[in-house]
């Protein structure tokens, strides 16, 4: 049995802390971007906006301007962290400094930047909403529809993360392979898979965009969040024909894999009948 060194223990604890922190941050983000806004409509709390105030007056309000400035600054900080650490020269420096923990460091700092964004986010309540569903019976039904759609989108996002090897995305697999002396797990994948992973940084674009834009009430701060993240996701999308062909090939293989046991069991039953 291989002995566990202090270094191995440190790597495992660091990766585990990162996993827990990212998981908690993900749950907080779901509540921040989705269910808190929908629950606000269902609970009948104070309105998110002041529709009686004209836009010309609201945009000159110092409180609105300060809140918008803070929110834009938070979004810029998050995007800089998320993009700068994914830049190839910076990735090489992180790899040389942190080694096998470089992916965990990236995920940890991303979660930290997201926590800062959510904690210091300033709702803009002194400006009108872009839209607000407040007429009966849609004031009840539309938030429920949004809740169901959001729930389905988050379920799809979780399933996609499972398909895309989430232990590797969070840096856990790298540490596990390092402790066993197996090397980098990404190098064990095919070149086409490595190419896809390098291009598909955000495999949940459609679902996340649906969550960002589908709400019963759409205040100004939500517009900032939705527009900024939409532009960021579009700019980060770099799939080409080869990647799409590889995805179609993998989907075809998965469908064949699921159909093979069924066909095999049917053939076995037929053979048993013949015997």
UniProtKB/Swiss-Prot annotation:
Which taxonomic lineage is given here? Eukaryota, Metazoa, Chordata, Craniata, Vertebrata
Q: Which family does it belong to?
A: Belongs to the nurim family.
- Cellular-component GO terms for this entry: nuclear envelope; nuclear inner membrane; nuclear membrane
Where mainly located?
Answer: nucleus
Q: Does the keyword Nucleus apply?
A: yes
**Full protein name:** Nurim
Q: How does it sit in the membrane?
A: Multi-pass membrane protein
User: Ranges in the Perinuclear space compartment?
Assistant: 33-63, 120-138, 216-221
What organism does the record attribute this protein to?
Danio rerio (Zebrafish)
Q: Show the stretches that span the lipid bilayer.
A: 5-32, 64-85, 103-119, 139-169, 197-215, 222-239
């Amino acid at each position: 049995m291989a002995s566990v060194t202090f270094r191995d223990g440190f790597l495992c604890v660091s990766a585990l802390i990162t996993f827990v922190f990212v998981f908690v941050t993900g749950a907080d983000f779901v509540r921040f971007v989705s269910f808190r806004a929908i629950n606000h409509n269902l609970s009948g709390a104070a309105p998110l906006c002041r529709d009686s105030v004209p836009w010309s007056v609201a945009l000159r309000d110092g409180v609105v301007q300060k809140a918008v400035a803070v929110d834009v600054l938070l979004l810029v900080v998050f995007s800089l962290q998320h993009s700068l650490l994914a830049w190839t020269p910076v990735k090489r420096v992180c790899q040389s400094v942190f080694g096998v923990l470089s992916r965990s460091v990236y995920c940890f700092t991303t979660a930290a930047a997201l926590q800062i964004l959510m904690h210091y986010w300033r709702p803009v309540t002194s400006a009108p909403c872009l839209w607000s569903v407040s007429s009966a019976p849609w004031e009840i039904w539309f938030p429920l529809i949004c809740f169901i759609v959001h729930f389905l989108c988050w379920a799809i996002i979780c399933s996609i993360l499972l398909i895309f090897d989430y232990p590797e995305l969070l840096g856990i697999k790298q540490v596990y392979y390092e402790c066993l002396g197996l090397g980098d797990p990404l190098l064990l994948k095919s070149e086409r898979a490595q190419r896809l992973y390098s291009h598909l940084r955000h495999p949940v674009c459609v679902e996340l965009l649906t969550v960002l834009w589908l709400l019963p009430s759409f205040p100004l701060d939500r517009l900032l969040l939705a527009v900024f993240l939409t532009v960021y996701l579009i700019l980060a999308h770099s799939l080409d024909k080869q990647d799409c062909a590889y995805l179609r090939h993998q989907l075809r293989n998965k469908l064949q894999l699921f159909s093979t046991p069924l066909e095999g069991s049917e053939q076995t039953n037929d053979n048993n009948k013949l015997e």
